[in-house]
């Protein structure tokens, strides 16, 4: 899975657009072995030292379910399989593209977190939050997207202001290509 250790098998409950892992040992394992999810009782965790449940995004949940690490159920206890998770996200037209990028980065050994606070799709770490700063912010595009040059300048300025490299991730089928921009001063 590209992680530093193998998390123990976990189970969670699908609630809205996330999966909640309530078993603390399972939650800690998922977080410590890849920084999956967000502990609900800690704003900025410094490791797996938390006592509450773990909230996983649907992207994280699908990835972990595909890897056989996470079993998902509905609140009534009925099982939610991998295909059911894919069906649950059909309302988001960008989900497939985002998931392909997420999976590709995870398989390359990166820790992938939400990039919302940076105005992008993902923040990508080499080691993990609290250990190092995310050197990259990644935004997903399809080959059909028209990118305004002003958007490129905006992305460059934003990434420079937060000391990160801005990466365009473009998906074609299941393949992902990356283009990184950086400031150049002659």
UniProtKB/Swiss-Prot annotation:
Cystine pairs: none
Catalytic residues (UniProt): 125, 133, 164
GO molecular function, one term: tRNA-intron endonuclease activity
Lineage of the organism: Archaea, Thermoproteota, Thermoprotei, Desulfurococcales, Desulfurococcaceae
Enzyme's top EC category: lyase
GO cellular component: cytoplasm
Keyword terms of this UniProt record: Lyase, tRNA processing
Role: Endonuclease that removes tRNA introns. Cleaves pre-tRNA at the 5'- and 3'-splice sites to release the intron. The products are an intron and two tRNA half-molecules bearing 2',3' cyclic phosphate and 5'-OH termini. Recognizes a pseudosymmetric substrate in which 2 bulged loops of 3 bases are separated by a stem of 4 bp.
The keyword tRNA processing is assigned to this record: yes
One Pfam family of this chain: tRNA_int_endo
Name of the encoding gene: endA
EC number: 4.6.1.16
Transmembrane found in the keyword field: no
Self-association and partners: Homotetramer; although the tetramer contains four active sites, only two participate in the cleavage. Therefore, it should be considered as a dimer of dimers.
GO terms, biological process: tRNA splicing, via endonucleolytic cleavage and ligation
Top-level taxon: Archaea
Catalytic reaction annotation: pretRNA = a 3'-half-tRNA molecule with a 5'-OH end + a 5'-half-tRNA molecule with a 2',3'-cyclic phosphate end + an intron with a 2',3'-cyclic phosphate and a 5'-hydroxyl terminus
UniProt family annotation: Belongs to the tRNA-intron endonuclease family. Archaeal short subfamily.
Protein name in the entry: tRNA-splicing endonuclease
CDD domains the record matches: tRNA-intron_lyase_C
């Amino acid at each position: 899975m590209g992680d530093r250790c193998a998390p123990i098998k976990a189970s969670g409950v699908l609630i809205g657009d996330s999966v909640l892992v309530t078993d603390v040992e399972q939650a800690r394992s998922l977080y410590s072995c890849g920084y999956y999810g967000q502990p609900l009782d800690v704003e900025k965790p410094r490791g797996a030292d938390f006592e509450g449940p773990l909230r996983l995004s649907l992207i994280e949940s699908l990835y972990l379910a595909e890897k056989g690490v996470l079993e998902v159920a509905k609140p009534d206890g009925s099982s939610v399989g991998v295909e059911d998770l894919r069906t649950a996200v059909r309302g988001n037209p960008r989900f497939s593209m985002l998931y392909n990028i997420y999976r590709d980065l995870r398989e390359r050994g990166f820790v992938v977190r939400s990039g919302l606070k940076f105005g992008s799709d993902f923040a990508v770490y080499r080691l993990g939050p609290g250990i190092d700063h995310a050197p990259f912010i990644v935004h997903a595009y399809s080959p059909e997207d028209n990118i305004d040059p002003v958007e490129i300048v905006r992305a460059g300025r934003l990434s420079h202001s937060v000391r990160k490299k801005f990466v365009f991730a473009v998906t074609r089928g299941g393949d992902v290509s990356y283009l990184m921009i950086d400031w150049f001063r002659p």
